[in-house]
């Protein structure tokens, strides 16, 4: 049995509810909302990113990475499957790509893969010099010797 397709306004409502639940640290509610979006639109890049963020907070890193990779792949469709030269946080498609890359960087960092994480953080800074995600600070932490996301200063 296929899940019922939701109307666009319901998809956007669920999507917004997912991010609101994430901000309130209500991870199971966020997961349920993002899964609801993905049941209708399995390529909704920012719902994939949201689900990746839920899994990241639950330390389900393989699942988080998979969601961020799917989100990145979906986001790149807007750019004809090529990485753009510049993105701007204020543009929704750009923001979605930044979230995917940032999520992948955080997963690498939490795993202690500092070289991979720093490379991704620097790529985010190159693409989006305004650095709305704090990638510059994360890269600086790595250069200062902080080995993982969870390491206390």
Where are these regions (language model features)?
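Alpha-helical linker/edge segments of TPR/alpha-solenoid repeat scaffolds
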Residues: 61-62, 91-107, 141-153
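TPR alpha-solenoid repeat register
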Residues: 47, 81, 100, 134-135
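Residue-level recognition of tetratricopeptide repeat
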Residues: 10, 44, 78, 114, ...
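Alpha-helical segment of the N-proximal tetratricopeptide repeat
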Residues: 7-39, 103, 107-110
